[in-house]
A protein has these predicted regions:
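A structural signal for short hydrophobic beta-strand segments in well-ordered beta-sheet cores
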Residues: 140-141
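Structural signature of FAD isoalloxazine-binding scaffolds in flavoprotein oxidoreductases
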Residues: 65-74, 132-136, 180, 209-210, ...
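C-terminal helix-coil-helix/basic helical segment that borders enzyme active sites and/or dimer interfaces
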Residues: 27-35, 251, 255-262, 278-311, ...
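Glycine-rich beta->alpha junctions and the first turn(s) of the following alpha-helix
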Residues: 2-8, 12-14, 52, 80, ...
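Internal helix-loop-helix
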Residues: 49-108, 112, 116-117, 157-164
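A short, Trp-centered hydrophobic/proline-enriched beta-strand micro-motif
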Residues: 117-128
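A short core secondary-structure module
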Residues: 124, 150-187
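Glycine-rich phosphate/cofactor-binding loops in nucleotide/flavin-utilizing enzymes
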Residues: 2, 13-15, 73, 93, ...
Length: 366
């Protein structure tokens, strides 16, 4: 298992960071957040122009034919800049799943528009009162050459701006994954307020009709398990960027801020907190990259994904709390950039199961 990045992978991360730091400045984020939806369509188009939207997609749909590791690098950069773009929803939950499990017709219908930035995707994994996303309560019943989908999905990322949602549902053969037009009859979106301000909605499906050609073929249970594992690792990649940047901001502040005639970073109590936070960032980093490496090499990694998500949640909360506390009062000032990182870390901690939920799931597997 080699975690050394290639020159091409480092270039992808560098291009993404430069683009996000140029466009997603604190001042610009404040402007975006004052609007109806925290989504920057112009930045999304710039990602398309930079060939970043197709990094993990096949060449025959306009992609760069890279893989999951490159996608994780891009997600980490989203977290570093808390960028207002649906990379996680569109590229990981949606496009990556269609690229791996869709037939050629499905890939050609959906993925070229993703690469150009004109189609946004998402997937609904979480359901009300259900703790295991791999066992959906949503149902799909056959209606001649189509399917009718009934059920609900909660906290669907980017649902307000997405065109299509992937829906795991129980069907005649067990479980399947269906591509649902979010503007179709029988689909109702109810936007929800989130901790980090990112667009999410509860989606209600009341007999929503899906064409037979919009069901992904293959073993549905394996598809959903794989999607869930990749979704967890994607969140961990974002969390790595979030916590690494929060620690960097805190390190700079403790170097510059003086008290009693010297930088507060010279005090032992502050040094200990910062050292513990550094160790926590490294725990998130290496558990995430272990799981991402396995997934990127076509291996199952549900256990490793759960371990990584545990660390992303547990350690992420400690890191951002430390970053705020060494700042004092300015750490929670909404005109200072750190507050966004605390909110993003909390959102990532709880999405698709907290640290305790990951431990419970890991324990139940033995």
């Amino acid at each position: 298992m080699d975690f050394t990045f290639t020159e091409e992978q480092e270039t992808i991360a560098e291009i993404a960071r430069q683009l996000f730091e140029h466009r997603a400045t604190p001042e610009h984020l404040t402007e975006v957040e004052a609007g109806a939806v925290r989504y920057d369509a112009a930045l999304w188009r710039e990602l398309a122009t930079a060939d970043l939207l197709g990094i993990a997609l096949p060449e025959n749909v306009g992609g760069s034919e890279h893989g999951f590791l490159e996608l994780a690098l891009l997600l980490a950069e989203v977290g570093w800049s808390v960028a207002p773009v649906p990379v996680y929803a569109t590229l990981l939950l949606g496009a990556d799943t269609i690229a791996r499990h869709g037939d050629e017709g499905q890939r050609q219908r959906y993925l070229p528009d993703v690469v150009t930035g004109s189609r946004l995707l998402t997937a609904g994994l979480a359901e009300p009162r259900r703790s295991d996303p791999t066992v959906p309560a949503t149902t799909a019943r056959r209606d001649r050459d189509s399917w009718r989908i009934d059920g609900s999905k909660e906290m669907v990322p980017a649902a307000q701006v997405a065109h299509t949602m992937l829906v795991p549902a129980v069907d005649d053969d067990g479980v399947g994954v269906f591509m649902v037009d979010l503007n179709a009859d029988g689909v109702e979106l109810r936007p929800v307020t989130t901790t980090n301000g990112e667009p999410h909605a509860d989606v209600f499906l009341n007999g929503a009709v899906v064409s037979g050609r919009d069901q992904l073929n293959g073993n549905g249970a394996e598809m959903i398990e794989s999607l869930h594992a990749r979704a967890l690792v994607g969140l961990c990649a974002i969390q790595l960027g979030v916590t690494e940047r929060a620690l960097r901001i805190a390190a700079a502040y403790t170097t510059e801020r003086e008290q009693f005639g010297r930088p507060i970073g010279s005090f032992q109590a502050v040094q200990q907190r910062m050292a513990d936070a550094f160790i926590d960032v490294e725990a998130i980093r290496w558990t995430m990259w272990q799981a991402a490496w396995l997934l990127g090499h076509g291996r199952r990694a549900s256990r490793e994904a759960g371990i990584a998500k545990f660390w992303a949640g547990e350690a992420g909360a400690r890191i951002t709390a430390t970053a705020q506390q060494v700042h004092g009062g300015i750490g929670i000032d909404t005109t200072y950039p750190l507050f966004r990182y605390f909110l993003w870390a909390k959102h990532n901690e709880l999405t698709l199961g907290s640290a305790s939920a990951q431990l419970a799931r890991l324990g139940a597997a033995y």
